[in-house]
């Protein structure tokens, strides 16, 4: 299996929305809303609103045999406009997701490594993310150098120096 990584293009936005749904509703159970319902949640809408129009927006798409299977992006937020994982205006928040059929195959690691390298080249010094405490991706984030910064009852805000 060969995983290809590429900078996102405007045409990738529908796939990024799919991946955002996969990331937010990662638990595959009977409580998972439909894609249409989940995509309408205010926090989900906010995450990709006006994507690519803000300075610093950066994303990567992972493909296998030209089929998109995962994506990640980071974005800067403000104290008046932010998503979970926000720390301050100088620390972009990372969002990552891999289609459930392609998890546990190293795709998440490759995506994070690519984005960290991109962040280094862009002069970014830190990156944050939010993860539920029971999300199996927590171990991936720790392996990739993210550390718990704050304990938010059911989730952690994590921070990584770049």
What are the roles of these predicted feature ranges?
Residues 1-14, 18, 22, 26:
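Conserved N-terminal entry element of GNAT/NAT acetyltransferase domains
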Residues 112, 119-132:
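Conserved GNAT acetyl-CoA-binding A-motif
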Residues 128-138, 155-159:
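Conserved beta-strand-loop-alpha-helix junction that forms the acyl-donor binding cleft
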